[in-house]
A protein has these predicted regions:
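Positively charged, phosphate-engaging catalytic surfaces used for nucleic-acid and nucleotide handling
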Residues: 1-96
């Protein structure tokens, strides 16, 4: 399962738990991944689509992207999901 599939699955789970629509939850994930963590999601997805081209042309870049991929693997998706769920739970508690 690649990063996109894991991210999509995680977003669907969070959307079901929170009752929010998929697009809203995905935009929250994208914001967390892109702005707060400094991880460029577009580079992650590009890495998975064009690995062969990078290997031929830019071996140092692929090493950097591979390290980024390993660091931000499932553990990072879980952390982002938990953060979004915590925020959602706090909003519910404030309403009560």
């Amino acid at each position: 399962m690649n990063f996109r599939q894991r991210a999509t699955e995680t977003v669907h789970i969070v959307a079901r738990i929170t009752g929010k629509d998929y697009g809203h939850v995905w935009s929250m994930f994208y914001y967390e991944l892109q702005t707060r963590s400094g991880i460029d999601l577009n580079l992650m997805l590009l890495r998975e689509r064009r690995t062969a081209q990078f290997l031929k042309k830019r071996k140092s870049e692929i090493r950097k992207l591979t390290m980024l991929y390993v660091i931000s693997n499932d553990t990072y998706l879980t952390m982002v999901a938990n953060k979004i769920l915590d925020t959602w739970a706090m909003k519910l508690l404030i309403k009560i």
